[in-house]
């Protein structure tokens, strides 16, 4: 069984395209094209389910048409309308010394600690709706929005899923 902390969201399936089972896919990260992985993970009825990719083709820099194995008709493809799509983290450079981070969404589920303020909480969401990407960090029922900026990150421990930051005064 695939767990939420083993994947990160990369987009959403929109609607069927044509009659042969292709699905329109809006993505925030093209990791599926850059990393060798034969499947995508879909969230269906609260369960993460892998689906093998037969083929895909880009329509723009944020949309693609995806053909999944076993999905051969528009009726079958329609079942994927508005389904969230995830990518398995194990295919992303998990080596301790690797700095290859595909997207800010990768950090969802990481604990965050500040070198001056201690533990800040856990990243529960990423707001990338503006040019300034924000981490939504939750601790004790309270939410803190923190800029997701490489200059603030002092240490990354992928095994412990811990992000150490040094945030300028006034942002916390």
UniProtKB/Swiss-Prot annotation:
Signal peptide: none annotated. The gene is rimM. Disulfide bonds: none annotated. Residues 99-171 form the PRC barrel domain. Binds ribosomal protein uS19. This is Ribosome maturation factor RimM. It is found in: Cytoplasm. GO terms for biological process: ribosomal small subunit biogenesis; rRNA processing. The PRC barrel domain binds ribosomal protein uS19. The lineage of its organism: Bacteria, Pseudomonadati, Bacteroidota, Bacteroidia, Bacteroidales. It comes from Phocaeicola vulgatus (strain ATCC 8482 / DSM 1447 / JCM 5826 / CCUG 4940 / NBRC 14291 / NCTC 11154). InterPro entries: PRC_barrel-like_sf, PRC_RimM, RimM, RimM_N, RimM_N_sf, Transl_B-barrel_sf.
């Amino acid at each position: 069984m695939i767990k939420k902390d083993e994947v990160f969201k990369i987009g959403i399936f929109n609607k069927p395209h044509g009659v042969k089972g292709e699905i329109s896919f809006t993505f925030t990260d093209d990791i599926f094209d850059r990393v060798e992985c034969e499947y995508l993970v879909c969230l269906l009825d609260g369960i993460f389910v892998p689906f093998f990719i037969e083929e895909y083709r880009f329509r723009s820099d944020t949309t693609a048409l995806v053909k999944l194995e076993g999905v051969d008709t528009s009726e079958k493809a329609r079942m994927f309308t508005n389904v969230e799509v995830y990518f398995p983290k194990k295919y992303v450079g998990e080596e301790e010394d690797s700095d290859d981070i595909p997207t800010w969404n990768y950090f969802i589920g990481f604990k965050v600690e500040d070198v001056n303020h201690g533990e800040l909480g856990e990243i529960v969401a990423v707001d990338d709706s503006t040019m300034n990407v924000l981490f939504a960090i939750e601790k004790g029922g309270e939410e803190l929005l923190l800029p997701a900026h490489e200059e603030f990150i002092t240490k990354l421990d992928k095994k412990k899923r811990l992000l150490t930051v040094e945030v300028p005064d006034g942002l916390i």
